[in-house]
A protein has these predicted regions:
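Soluble extracytoplasmic regions of secretory-pathway and membrane proteins
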Residues: 4-587
Length: 587
């Protein structure tokens, strides 16, 4: 806050000097008026716009210096026209100062930042490690189809908004904000908006979280805080929790995007010691106790005024406003994302464009590569990665590989796997699947998974609304390898059959696609979040999964029962069942 006040005072002094008139009888009146107006105007502007107050690498301070110079120039021009002719030479000299400042600022910024002069530095912002295709299965572990992300952001936000619509007293003053995906762990006691007390348990579960926000200035003025947040499972659209109490204490979220004055989250950070820091990517996350925080990326430019690199994060308590700053290596384990996707997309493009210099990137474009549109989150063993396809410049549907970038550390791996990009995968399903075409379904943005060692796009399908109407799998390596069905389990079964019958590449070593029924004895069975986990006497060291949506008999399964099952035998520790039937069982 001090920086904003001091700089507004500095601008006021400039205006006062420009307005000063030695010949006037009231020579102090005009400077005081001009300086006071300047101080108030720029003070309010600073508090509203919150520029980054750092001389090098950020535009905010330079822009305000230029504005101050122009402000002085305007006063100077007025006095040159109406003032004492004897002072005109002084005013002309004063006019040269703001013009010189503007030109100097422009030259310094361009010279220190332009890709033409710093192409090598831009190309080295991201340093991917090229790894063999065969290592993909080791780096990205397969997960059960029931744990794949089937609820997109827009769908999660719609589900949450419908929940609050059923509460008129709350819905009239609040609404849910932007949903952020996190990998949630922990067990904590909550009370929901419906008054239900329960204990929630999450084990590396992907969920969408969103805070309750104010509906405008007057709602903030009346209430100051909101009553909680919403959790929506990214796997199961029926698993929604509107949390208003945590461990017996009512939630009161104060520092929000919809807050005003000092309660607005960015202004709160800027006015509490972080005016000179680059801040971006305000994401909501929960710790292992369900406590809500803002996780904000701290960054600094590495090439003049560009080449932004994340250096750490701020963790802000959404209730108390307490701010903790962490370096990347010291951030709490529950923090998922520090690296903003917008930074990484720029760095991927810079890496792909400037490997052979700026001139080649602009003209010949030999070997120039770029990121495919958009990025998506990929999860493996509790860690999250940004996924981006890599394609040759100007390519529409093909990709020459893909990158996985750790969302905390920026560790980057490049898989040089030729195939199709995300847009092409969507078009394959919409155009080549007869069921999808006849149903007039649209494919949503895909997420990359390891399906028995094969890099595979998984996507949801929607009809007229945003509710899921189907599910699809498409191989990254071949547009001929795809399947779509009404449930994820059926789509996966069809996809595995397609791979088995017409694969143009080998399934990862040790994977055997077998559909024959195998007789097993149930050693143990538990249900967690709608997914059944089963152990068999005949198979040690592995657990099998399924849902009652795919196999209704699972709800009646007990220990020591004999069952017929089929599955794809892989090296994974958790395997999805392809079929399940209890022997001699009748309802």
């Amino acid at each position: 806050m001090v920086q904003y006040i001091l700089f507004a005072l500095f601008l006021g002094v400039i205006s006062a000097v420009a307005a000063f008139d030695l010949e006037s009888k009231k020579k102090w009146l005009k400077p005081v008026i001009a300086g006071s107006i300047s101080f108030l105007v720029f003070g309010i502007l600073n508090f509203w716009a919150m520029p980054t107050f750092n001389f090098w690498g950020f535009d905010g301070l330079w822009v305000e210096i230029t504005l101050a110079a122009i402000w002085g120039l305007l006063f100077s021009a007025i006095y040159e026209e109406y003032g004492d002719p004897a002072l005109k030479n002084i005013f002309k000299m004063w006019q040269a100062i703001p013009l010189g400042i503007c030109m100097l600022a422009l030259l310094v910024r361009c010279g220190s930042t332009a890709e033409m002069f710093h192409s090598e530095a831009y190309s080295e912002l991201l340093q991917p490690q090229v790894v063999a295709d065969s290592t993909f299965a080791n780096n990205v572990h397969p997960i059960p189809v029931e744990k794949m992300i089937s609820v997109k952001q827009a769908y999660a936000e719609d589900l949450a908004s419908k929940r609050i619509e059923n509460m008129p007293s709350l819905g009239s003053r609040c609404e849910f904000g932007q949903a952020d995906m996190i990998n949630l762990n922990g067990t904590f006691a909550v009370k929901t908006a419906e008054g239900k007390s329960e204990t929630l348990t999450f084990d590396n579960e992907k969920v969408w979280v969103m805070p309750l926000e104010h509906r405008g200035f007057w709602k903030w003025w009346d209430n100051k805080v909101t009553d909680g947040y919403c959790i929506v499972s990214a796997h199961d659209p029926g698993r929604i929790f509107f949390v208003t109490e945590l461990e017996g204490k009512p939630l009161a979220l104060r520092y929000l995007r919809s807050g005003c004055f000092g309660d607005e989250i960015e202004r709160h950070c800027r006015t509490n010691g972080y005016a000179g820091y680059g801040l971006t990517e305000y994401s909501m996350e929960l710790d292992d106790n369900g406590k809500p925080y803002w996780v904000i990326t701290v960054y600094e430019p590495s090439i003049g005024f560009s080449g932004e690199n994340a250096t750490g994060c701020l963790v802000v308590d959404m209730q108390t406003g307490d701010i903790q700053e962490y370096a990347i290596a010291d951030a709490p384990e529950w923090v998922d994302r520090i690296q903003p996707d917008e930074f990484l997309l720029d760095q991927i493009d810079d890496w792909g464009q400037y490997q052979d210099g700026w001139i080649n990137a602009q003209f010949a474009q030999n070997g120039v590569r770029e990121a495919t549109p958009g990025m998506s989150l990929v999860y493996s063993e509790g860690r999250s990665y940004w996924y981006s396809g890599i394609q040759s410049a100007g390519a529409d549907k093909s990709s020459s590989g893909f990158m996985l970038i750790d969302t905390r550390t920026k560790e980057c791996k490049l898989y040089p796997v030729a195939g199709i990009n995300e847009q092409a995968a969507k078009e394959v399903i919409e155009a080549q699947s007869e069921w999808v075409r006849q149903s007039k379904f649209a494919a949503n943005d895909p997420v990359l998974y390891n399906v028995h060692g094969v890099p595979t796009y998984y996507m949801t399908l929607t009809g007229d609304g945003i509710k899921n109407a189907g599910y699809a799998f498409v191989s990254l390596k071949s547009e001929l390898q795809f399947a779509a069905a009404a449930t994820p389990q059926k789509a996966l079964q069809q996809y595995l059959k397609v791979i088995q019958s017409g694969s143009q590449f080998k399934i990862s070593d040790g994977d055997k696609l077998a559909e024959e029924l195998v007789k097993m004895t149930v050693r143990g069975i538990v249900c967690e979040n709608g997914t059944y986990y089963i152990l068999f006497n005949e198979v040690k060291g592995k657990e099998f999964t399924g849902t009652t949506e795919a196999f209704p008999e699972l709800k009646w399964c007990e220990k020591n029962q004999k069952v017929n099952v089929s599955y794809t035998d892989t090296e994974a520790k958790v395997i999805s069942l392809n079929s399940f039937d209890i022997i001699d069982f009748e309802i």
